[in-house]
Amino acid sequence: ITPLIDKIAEFIIAFHQSKVLDNVMKDSYSIVSNLPYNISTPILFHLFEYLDIIQDMHFMLQKEVVDRMIAAPSSPEYGRLSVMLQYYFAMEHLVHVPKESFDPEPKVESSFVRLIPYEHYPFVANNIEQFGRIVKEAFSQRRKTIRNTLKSFISENDFQKIGINPQL
């Protein structure tokens, strides 16, 4: 059954990447889904392209993914997923769904979450692609100092100008 699940996951990603929806979706939509847990993150990132037609989204996801989505800065769960989703969406953890709620019982806990695209972003990223690259790089090597991780984007002098300790 695993090869079948992999094929379904590939189809979902290929469908999302095909831009088929571009000509069909003209209004504002609510999306409700039990996303396949193994491909939920790429799907969430892909949905950034459709913010202008998304009213809100409700997803059943693996609990650990929801924990990362809504994580606060400085928490162990806080990372790229947190930063990017919190830039685009107000999020609300609606309910925890214990694994005992399913038959057969899965190995993981689930959570139901609501995402509402911001009308006005919490801050302005002048170049969203560059912002995404910086966030990705910043969380790719957590054990390195921020100076070493982001040296291709920001000089040590610039860190000092904006009041960030480059030794963090």
Spell out what each predicted region is.
Residues 1-129, 133, 160:
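Catalytic cores of RNA-modifying enzymes
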Residues 135-168:
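C-terminal lobe and adjacent flexible extensions of AdoMet/dcAdoMet transferase-like proteins
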